[in-house]
């Protein structure tokens, strides 16, 4: 028999913290060929045909029917160049696992993909798929204590946009940063917490900017804080968009006629986890 004291129980209970989780729904035009191209990660499930409700945020023409899939994330969702690099790496690791055999080789492969896909040399590349996200996305959010959607402009320099719940992006980095009270007040932000029902939305401009952010010499491009997010993705010249959720990337086919929508809202009841820092 193992005996424990009341102090041990109190210590255990004091280390339990709440963690918000986020429900994501992707609504894409129902096109047979596009759906066949879609290879979803394990964290997402296919819902089939569903109804899309426009709250007045949509800018493009809406299709008659949409195909939906959904999932839940705890850490982050991202769209853009970082997800494209992650997708390329995951594809290579699946096809040729012997190449990704250790931390050093993984880092070299990642570096190769960032250069190949133009993250470091944007100005030298004319391919529209390698330009800023402002060309294809429209960002709408709901702020704290507000039920209305608000359009938020995405800076033209941003090539990856991230919605972050935990301060643990890309192997433990904190790209949002530890912001000073004066800056928080100026921007209308609050101190970021993992259980506050708020996502921090930031952008990464290009490889050099992302590299400095990852070593925490600078912060990412702060865009907004939100309790709900809607992204409208307009195809046009873009055939695909790259997304990832808690490290699982996928290639999202886009329609040339209709928009694809990503809706993110908080799961009503938070999860309970043990804070490892207290143990």
Question: What is the predicted role of each segment?
Answer:
Residues 132, 136, 141-153, 163, ...:
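ATP/nucleoside-binding phosphotransfer catalytic cores, i.e., glycine-rich phosphate-binding loops
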